[in-house]
């Protein structure tokens, strides 16, 4: 919406027909997201077979079935070494799990990502995960899909906001293709990536995720990844869900804190960061030697945990080893994702807790605990709940999922200043505020905050009289509106408007020739416009004050709005947020 445009008809949304064009581009991006997911998953399978079974194959095989013995310790080290070299001499953007990097590009990089990232991120992630790295494909596909969306957007004349929409469309389309969870992917965009809730961004993301969801069965398996059907729940499950949520949130906070402590320890090493992933690989290799199921993506392990195929002791061992090697590996700055490891860790917690939690069958608690851990780490409870449902299609679990993720989210919100998603960005000097609300400037109109008493200069005064009366020692304002005898606005003048060579005997009206009037016609505010529109117009044209007129035809001056007036809506907002009062007695 142009800052100079005047809108006479109020609407719920500011979307226009450009939304259709962006949505059409999102269709292409959705298809590309599916292709990118297919390529990434096959890269992971290829490198898994190459590292652990010394074969060139795209077959789905788990690292846990290897027979390498102690040699398995060297594989994550080798993978980390290769990725360190790729990051050093290719692109440093491939380091990390992808989501913070995508957020940084969205908020502070005008949503511009390079082709290098689109190529090197899936390659590096395939190598790391294929060599035993305890990561999932979702972080890399979010970064890769986002890079593809950004690159396609850069082919067109788009605003940074439109590029952001297409970047997020690519990221969420990739996530949809990997997991088959389009609704959860849209919610991830809303809760974590878009930083707004508007049709201009929501609709293209929905389109891209829908296209990815429809095209997914053409290249990947159809249906839920982990089909599950739990039994009905009793009232006692209410208290069990609260406890599971608290413990899931506590585990989330513990892992988040541990991750950045490990990252700080790596930062103190007298070695270039290029070597850190190889050092982290040592811990991964040792952990994988004692607990092979902790290596790699581990989708098969998630299925075993959800279906109760692991005993409590095995689940506890897996939980501890997976958490430790994940924290160390990710803290070393290697390339990987967070969702799949969190699912394993959370499901392991649920398996351990299941014998002591009444109200639901044993399969319910691994599911709700994995969603709780995910909600706590991401700070996205709706995404976590719907994601867990999308993975299993278990309708009986929806209510427990909602409560457990909400409790875990509340726990981490109250106990953690930052999440894994934002801490890295904050350490680079950026502040991210994740609470959204209606802009106070959007809720009040110009006529509610403007000054109704206006000092205006009659156009019939001479230039000399104007300078003497309004721009002499008694000057009050930097600029003044100039009006004709019917109080119709001609324009605004300030001292710099008068040329030193100007004839002081000329009437002030001579300054306002037809060309000037046409150029400045839009530089007014209407009383029915919101303060946000007025603020945008003032910021765009570097103005301190805007004259307020009844309408654009008569241009009759009725007030003036200044920058200081735009503070008034914030006072009302402050009263609503801070002023406590009892209304019923």
Model-identified regions with their sequence ranges:
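Alpha-helical transmembrane segments and immediately membrane-proximal extracytoplasmic
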Residues: 1-443, 447, 451-464, 477-480, ...
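Short, acidic, Ser/Thr-enriched surface-loop or helix-capping motifs
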Residues: 483-485, 549-552
């Amino acid at each position: 919406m142009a800052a100079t445009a005047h809108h006479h008809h109020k609407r719920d949304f500011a979307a226009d027909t450009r939304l259709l064009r962006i949505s059409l581009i999102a269709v292409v991006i959705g298809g590309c997201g599916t292709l990118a997911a297919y390529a990434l998953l096959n890269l992971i399978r290829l490198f898994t077979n190459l590292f652990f079974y010394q074969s060139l194959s795209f077959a789905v095989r788990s690292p846990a079935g290897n027979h390498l013995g102690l040699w398995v310790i060297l594989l994550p080290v080798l993978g980390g070494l290769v990725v360190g070299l790729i990051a050093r001499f290719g692109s440093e953007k491939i380091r990390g799990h992808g989501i913070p990097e995508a957020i940084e590009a969205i908020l502070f990089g005008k949503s511009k990502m390079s082709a290098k990232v689109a190529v090197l991120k899936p390659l590096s992630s395939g190598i790391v995960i294929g060599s035993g790295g305890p990561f999932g494909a979702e972080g890399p596909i979010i970064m890769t899909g986002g890079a593809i969306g950004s690159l396609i957007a850069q082919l067109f004349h788009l605003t940074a906001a439109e590029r952001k929409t297409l970047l997020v469309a690519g990221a969420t389309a990739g996530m949809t293709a990997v997991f088959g969870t389009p609704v959860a992917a849209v919610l991830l965009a809303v809760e974590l990536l878009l930083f707004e809730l508007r049709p201009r961004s929501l609709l293209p993301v929905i389109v891209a995720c829908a296209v990815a969801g429809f095209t997914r069965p053409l290249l990947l398996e159809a249906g839920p990844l982990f089909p599950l059907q739990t039994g009905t729940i009793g009232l006692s499950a209410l208290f069990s869900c609260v406890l599971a949520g608290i413990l899931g949130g506590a585990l989330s906070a513990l892992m988040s804190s541990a991750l950045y402590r490990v990252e700080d320890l790596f930062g103190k090493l007298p070695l270039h960061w290029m070597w850190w992933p190889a050092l982290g690989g040592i811990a991964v290799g040792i952990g994988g030697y004692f607990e092979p199921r902790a290596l790699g993506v581990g989708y098969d392990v998630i299925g075993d945990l959800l279906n109760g195929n692991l005993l409590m002791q095995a689940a506890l061992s897996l939980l501890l080893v997976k958490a430790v090697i994940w924290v160390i590996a990710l803290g070393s700055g290697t390339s990987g994702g967070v969702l799949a490891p969190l699912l394993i860790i959370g499901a392991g917690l649920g398996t351990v807790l299941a014998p002591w939690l009444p109200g639901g069958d044993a399969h319910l608690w691994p599911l709700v605990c994995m969603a709780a851990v995910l909600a706590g780490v991401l700070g996205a409870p709706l995404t976590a709940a719907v994601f867990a449902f999308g993975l299993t299609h278990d309708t009986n679990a929806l209510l427990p999922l909602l409560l457990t993720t909400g409790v875990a989210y509340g726990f981490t919100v109250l106990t953690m200043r930052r999440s894994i998603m934002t801490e890295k960005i904050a350490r680079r000097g950026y502040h991210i505020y994740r609470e959204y609300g209606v802009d106070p400037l959007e809720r009040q109109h110009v006529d509610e905050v403007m000054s109704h008493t206006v000092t205006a200069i009659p156009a019939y005064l001479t230039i000399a009289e104007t300078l003497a009366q309004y721009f002499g020692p008694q000057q009050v304002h930097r600029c003044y509106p100039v009006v004709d005898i019917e109080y119709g606005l001609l324009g605004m003048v300030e001292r710099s408007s008068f040329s030193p060579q100007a004839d002081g005997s000329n009437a002030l009206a001579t300054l306002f020739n037809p060309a000037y009037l046409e150029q400045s016609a839009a530089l007014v505010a209407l009383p029915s416009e919101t303060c946000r529109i007025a603020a945008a117009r003032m910021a765009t044209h570097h103005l301190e004050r805007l004259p307020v007129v009844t309408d654009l035809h008569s241009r009759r001056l009725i007030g003036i709005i200044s920058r200081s007036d735009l503070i008034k809506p914030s006072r009302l907002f402050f009263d609503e947020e801070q002023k406590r009062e009892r209304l019923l007695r």
